[in-house]
C-alpha cells in the first residue's frame, strides 16, 4: 500500500513539475513574442541611441500633413518624426479634449503655492469650465508622468532631463502635454475671461458662419473642387493667438519675430503635426546643444545641415562672427535669446510658418479663410480678390488689407504664407485646421499693437505677466 501511495505522490509531483515548467515556458514565450512585436514599432531605451533626428528646417521632400508612419522595409521606426506620429496618431475629425493643463513648482494645496495664483487658477477650474478636466502638474510629478506618457519615445524624455534650465523645461512640457493628451494649456499667471465653450474654436455656429460669409482664399496649388464640406466644418486642430504684431520700423530691437505667436495659452487636439514638428526640433536641438548628451549625436543628425541643430546658430546669432557658436550650453550660460529660439515663442512661430508653407506646397485642398482681408473695418466689406478702394489712409494703415498685394503675390506665386497674413487681425483666421486668434484674444489690455480691453468680445484669456524669464535668463548668463 505504501509503495502505491509513494508512486502516486511521485507521479503527482512529476505532473506538477511538468505543468509548472510548461506554464513558465508559455509565459516566457509570450513575453519574448510580445517584446519582439513591440520592438517592431517602439525602440527600447537601448535602441534610442540609433534614432535618426531629421531637421525641421529642411523638410522639402515630405508632406508634413500626411506623414506616413510605417517603414515597410525595416518594419521599425528609426526616425523620431515617425516614432512620434505612430505613438500619437492625429485624428483631425476628433473633438478637442475637454482638458485644462497648468504647471507649477508645487501643487495648489502646498503652502508655498502663490496666493495670487489661486484667484487665477479658479477661473480655469471653476464655473467657466465646469465640464473640463483640470490638471495641475507639479515639478515632482513631471518626470514620472512623462516616463509613462512618452515611454514609446524615450529619447524625448532624455532630452527633457538634459535641458539646462527650468524655463526651457516649462516650455517643452506644455507641448508634450498637448501633443500626447490634447486640450488647453495655459500659464499659471493667466485668467480665463469667458467660458471656454464661447471661444470661436468651440462655437459651431461661428465656424459655420465664417465659412458661409468668406470665400476660401486661393493659392498657387489650390483646387477649390477638392475642398470637402465635411473637412471644412470640423473643429480646428490647433488654436493659437498673436503675441506680438509690432508695425514699426525698429520692431527687431524689441521682438524676435515680426509676427510672434503666443504660447502661454494653446488649445490643441492630441497628435497635431505642428506640435510633432516642434517636439522633434526641441529634442534634436537639446541633444546637439548641451554638454554630455549621452548619445552619439553626430550619428543621429543629418550631416548636411549640422547648424540647424545648434541653438547658437539660431536667428540673429547665425551671422554673428563674434559669437562662440561651438560653445555647448549649460545652466550657467543659457540666456534669453537661447530660450526664445530653443523652446520659446521664436521657434514656436518659426515651426508654425514652416508647417504652413509645407502644407501649401504639397496639398491642393488647404482651406484659407481671413475675414480681415474681406473688409475695411467700419467701411464695409469687399472681396479679397480685389484691392481696397476708397478707403482713407488711416483706416487702411491699420488693416490687414494694407498688405493685400504682398499676401496675394506670396500665396499665388510661390505657395508661401507671409507674416502679413496675420497682421492687424480683428477676427480669427483659419489656415487648414489651424485657427489664429487676434492679439486681443490672449493679450487684452496691453495697450499696444491693436489689442483691445478685457471687455472686448474677442478677449478670452488675460496674461498677468507675473514672470520675467528673459530678464532672469540674461542675468543668469552674465548679460545686462
Swiss-Prot record:
<dbReference type="GO" id="GO:0000136">
    <property type="term" value="C:mannan polymerase complex"/>
</dbReference>
<feature type="glycosylation site" description="N-linked (GlcNAc...) asparagine">
    <location>
        <position position="281"/>
    </location>
</feature>
<feature type="glycosylation site" description="N-linked (GlcNAc...) asparagine">
    <location>
        <position position="203"/>
    </location>
</feature>
<dbReference type="GO" id="GO:0000137">
    <property type="term" value="C:Golgi cis cisterna"/>
</dbReference>
<dbReference type="GO" id="GO:0005789">
    <property type="term" value="C:endoplasmic reticulum membrane"/>
</dbReference>
<dbReference type="GO" id="GO:0033164">
    <property type="term" value="F:glycolipid 1,6-alpha-mannosyltransferase activity"/>
</dbReference>
<feature type="transmembrane region" description="Helical; Signal-anchor for type II membrane protein">
    <location>
        <begin position="16"/>
        <end position="30"/>
    </location>
</feature>
<dbReference type="GO" id="GO:0006487">
    <property type="term" value="P:protein N-linked glycosylation"/>
</dbReference>
<keyword id="KW-1133">Transmembrane helix</keyword>
<keyword id="KW-0256">Endoplasmic reticulum</keyword>
<feature type="topological domain" description="Cytoplasmic">
    <location>
        <begin position="1"/>
        <end position="15"/>
    </location>
</feature>
<keyword id="KW-0735">Signal-anchor</keyword>
<dbReference type="InterPro" id="IPR029044">
    <property type="entry name" value="Nucleotide-diphossugar_trans"/>
</dbReference>
<dbReference type="InterPro" id="IPR039367">
    <property type="entry name" value="Och1-like"/>
</dbReference>
<protein>
    <recommendedName>
        <fullName>Initiation-specific alpha-1,6-mannosyltransferase</fullName>
        <ecNumber>2.4.1.232</ecNumber>
    </recommendedName>
</protein>
<comment type="function">
    <text>Mannosyltransferase involved in outer chain elongation of asparagine-linked oligosaccharides of the type Man(9)GlcNAc(2). Adds the first alpha-1,6-mannose to the Man(8)GlcNAc(2) and Man(9)GlcNAc(2), but not Man(5)GlcNAc(2), endoplasmic reticulum intermediates. Represents the first enzymatic event required for synthesis of outer chain mannose linkages on yeast secretory proteins. Also has the potential to transfer a second alpha-1,6-mannose to the Man(8)GlcNAc(2) core oligosaccharide.</text>
</comment>
<keyword id="KW-0328">Glycosyltransferase</keyword>
<comment type="similarity">
    <text>Belongs to the glycosyltransferase 32 family.</text>
</comment>
<dbReference type="InterPro" id="IPR007577">
    <property type="entry name" value="GlycoTrfase_DXD_sugar-bd_CS"/>
</dbReference>
<dbReference type="Pfam" id="PF04488">
    <property type="entry name" value="Gly_transf_sug"/>
</dbReference>
<feature type="short sequence motif" description="DXD motif">
    <location>
        <begin position="187"/>
        <end position="189"/>
    </location>
</feature>
<keyword id="KW-0808">Transferase</keyword>
<keyword id="KW-0812">Transmembrane</keyword>
<keyword id="KW-0333">Golgi apparatus</keyword>
<feature type="topological domain" description="Lumenal">
    <location>
        <begin position="31"/>
        <end position="480"/>
    </location>
</feature>
<keyword id="KW-0472">Membrane</keyword>
<dbReference type="GO" id="GO:0000009">
    <property type="term" value="F:alpha-1,6-mannosyltransferase activity"/>
</dbReference>
<feature type="glycosylation site" description="N-linked (GlcNAc...) asparagine">
    <location>
        <position position="341"/>
    </location>
</feature>
<feature type="glycosylation site" description="N-linked (GlcNAc...) asparagine">
    <location>
        <position position="393"/>
    </location>
</feature>
<keyword id="KW-0325">Glycoprotein</keyword>
